[in-house]
């Protein structure tokens, strides 16, 4: 019998240094830590989904044709230019697997979504960091376009990832800067528009003209389907075809495929929810801005990054008052900061009251 195995020695070095992702869950707390849509699904949608004819004893459609046709109508991108995934996390790792690896590298702009670097490390892909720049106000960020183009010129770089609006800062980068990077870098540019429905901005319309452009979107945010893990990539058929070579054959389950296809029929209702959440976040931002001791960063998403004098204390005291937000720890350019997303109108009213009591 084997008593002990050399796990650490057998691990790839890039995995050995990683820490497992941990999602915090505190019972009886209102969750404002994951940038989810807290509002209920539009009336009739759950009934339509549960009444659907889904063969649970059969493998799902590996090509997700019904969902891709619905996405094609929603985005204007042909079905052959769409790839669906088990959440954006799977798609990010698929991108690194396909175009990265030990001989490839990706350019990212910290502070940004942590999964880009995590997926790169797992796949052995090199990471080149070109930090964002603070604007003169000190409350907003911008891309270092020249720095990103310089980094992208290195031969091992195959990809650039731009998160727009950016998580966790909420920054919306100018369209012309993104398209300049697409045009001048010559590398694959992935624009993560997970929060694009809140900003109202997108570069999807440029896909027909840019063979190196990929746009990533999700059903986890505005469409309130975080539990079902459903994301998608948009691009020209050639680059989507390349990614399909490395994709798992049945990567999106039948229930999620059907839910996504049905959700896209409720576009008007979800757009209204987006307006509600944007207005609710504005109330929270206004309340935070009223405190001179709090730095509030500009946002075009459904969340806001802010910096009180003692972030750890504010975080813990909010938990004590029934609210779980995200403690971002030490962020590049920022330092210790907190992030919270808009909740329901009722929860936001209670949150603003709690913040007032803590920050006074």
Swiss-Prot record:
Enzyme class: transferase
Lineage: Bacteria, Bacillati, Bacillota, Clostridia, Eubacteriales
A GO BP annotation: L-histidine biosynthetic process
Any GO MF annotation of the entry: histidinol-phosphate transaminase activity
Assigned protein family: Belongs to the class-II pyridoxal-phosphate-dependent aminotransferase family. Histidinol-phosphate aminotransferase subfamily.
Subunit structure of this chain's protein: Homodimer.
Protein name: Histidinol-phosphate aminotransferase
InterPro entries: Aminotransferase_I/II_large, HisP_aminotrans, PyrdxlP-dep_Trfase, PyrdxlP-dep_Trfase_major, PyrdxlP-dep_Trfase_small
Keywords assigned: Amino-acid biosynthesis, Aminotransferase, Histidine biosynthesis, Pyridoxal phosphate, Transferase
Pathway(s) the chain acts in: Amino-acid biosynthesis; L-histidine biosynthesis; L-histidine from 5-phospho-alpha-D-ribose 1-diphosphate: step 7/9
Keyword Zinc-finger: no
Listed EC numbers: 2.6.1.9
Recorded catalytic activity of this chain's protein: L-histidinol phosphate + 2-oxoglutarate = 3-(imidazol-4-yl)-2-oxopropyl phosphate + L-glutamate
